[in-house]
């Protein structure tokens, strides 16, 4: 309504120009000098300021020779000077006021009534800032004793995968938690798989890390394996003891033969002497 009232009070030429601003919709017609003068008068007398578009210029267009032919750009990029004295210095309302003169006056009056507006704006900007995300504290690395490592390694040699009851028993016997035992077993299994693959053997687990069928030994298989290992160790001890006894048996006949070999050359001269003592046969 305000815009229509001001248009009625204006001259007939301006009213006619307002009713039919553009003859055509060509770029040259829109940016012509006549249209430029019309928008300049609107900006000076604040007639329907919402119709005047004033985008914030990204760079200066005055130096470009190709844009000097369009005088409307100077009107669009021009900032209003009518209400510049009403804008409080240092406030955050300047970009809003430069776009809309009517809103500029209302905002200036509101800022004059509330002197603590700057503090409110700063507090709102502080609350809008996102709080920094706190990092999750890193879990400390468990340091195992030598006795615990020996117990874990011995159990791992017998059983590569632990059930929940076995894990609980092992954790209680070594003074550890189930999580510590589980983590150690996971790391140890990874080393074991790498060693198996380096040796040129088939991977003991599936691609997703699950154990293959019959790869987890049962308690009966573990006991049978222990018996076989003990029997193999006892056989090795017997063989080693027999090897140590064999050199003593082989040395005895050699010792007996040595005096006989030495005595043989001694008897030969005696036989010759006896033969020489006999008288020669008569011819």
UniProtKB/Swiss-Prot annotation:
Residues 139-198 bind DNA. It holds the Pfam family Homeodomain. One of its GO terms (biological process) is positive regulation of transcription by RNA polymerase II. One of its GO terms (cellular component) is transcription regulator complex. GO terms for molecular function: chromatin binding; DNA binding; DNA-binding transcription activator activity, RNA polymerase II-specific; DNA-binding transcription factor activity; RNA polymerase II transcription regulatory region sequence-specific DNA binding; sequence-specific DNA binding. Nervous system, particularly in the telencephalon, spinal cord, and dorsal root ganglia. Residues 268-277 have a biased composition (Low complexity). InterPro entries: HD (IPR001356), HD_metazoa (IPR020479), Homeobox_CS (IPR017970), Homeobox_TF (IPR050848), Homeodomain-like_sf (IPR009057), HTH_motif (IPR000047). Residues 122-132 have a biased composition (Polar residues). CDD domains: homeodomain. Keywords: DNA-binding, Homeobox, Nucleus, Transcription, Transcription regulation. It comes from the Eukaryota. Residues 107-141, 198-283 are annotated as: Disordered. SMART domains: HOX. It is found in: Nucleus. Disulfide bonds: none annotated. Belongs to the BAR homeobox family. Transcription factor. Binds optimally to the DNA consensus sequence 5'-YYTAATGRTTTTY-3'. May control the expression of neural adhesion molecules such as L1 or Ng-CAM during embryonic development of both the central and peripherical nervous system. May be involved in controlling adhesive processes in keratinizing epithelia. This is Homeobox protein BarH-like 2. It comes from Mus musculus. The gene is Barx2.
């Amino acid at each position: 309504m305000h815009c229509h009232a001001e248009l009625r009070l204006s001259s007939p030429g301006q009213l006619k120009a307002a009713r039919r601003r553009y003859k055509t919709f060509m770029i040259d017609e829109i940016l012509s000098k006549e249209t430029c003068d019309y928008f300049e008068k609107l900006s000076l007398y604040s007639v329907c300021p919402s119709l005047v578009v004033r985008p914030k210029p990204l760079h200066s267009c005055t130096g470009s020779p190709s844009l000097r032919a369009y005088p409307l750009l100077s009107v669009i990029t021009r900032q209003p000077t009518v209400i510049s004295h009403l804008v409080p210095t240092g406030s955050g309302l300047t970009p809003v006021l430069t776009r809309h003169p009517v809103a500029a006056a209302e905002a200036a009056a509101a800022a004059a009534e509330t002197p603590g507006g700057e503090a409110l704006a700063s507090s709102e900007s502080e609350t809008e800032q996102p709080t920094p995300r706190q990092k999750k504290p890193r879990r400390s690395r468990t340091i195992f004793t030598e006795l615990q490592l020996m117990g874990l390694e011995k159990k791992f040699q017998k059983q590569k995968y632990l059930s929940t009851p076995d894990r609980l028993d092992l954790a209680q016997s070594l003074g550890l938690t189930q999580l510590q035992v589980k983590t150690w077993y996971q790391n140890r299994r990874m080393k074991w798989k790498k060693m198996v693959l380096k040796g040129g053997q088939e991977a003991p687990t599936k691609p997703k890390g699950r154990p293959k069928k019959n790869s987890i030994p049962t308690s009966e298989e573990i006991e049978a394996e222990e018996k076989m290992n003990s029997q193999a160790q006892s056989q090795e001890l017997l063989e080693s003891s027999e090897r140590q006894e064999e050199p003593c048996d082989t040395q005895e006949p050699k010792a007996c033969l040595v005096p006989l070999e030495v005595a043989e050359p001694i008897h030969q001269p005696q036989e010759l002497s006896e033969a020489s003592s006999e008288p020669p046969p008569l011819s």
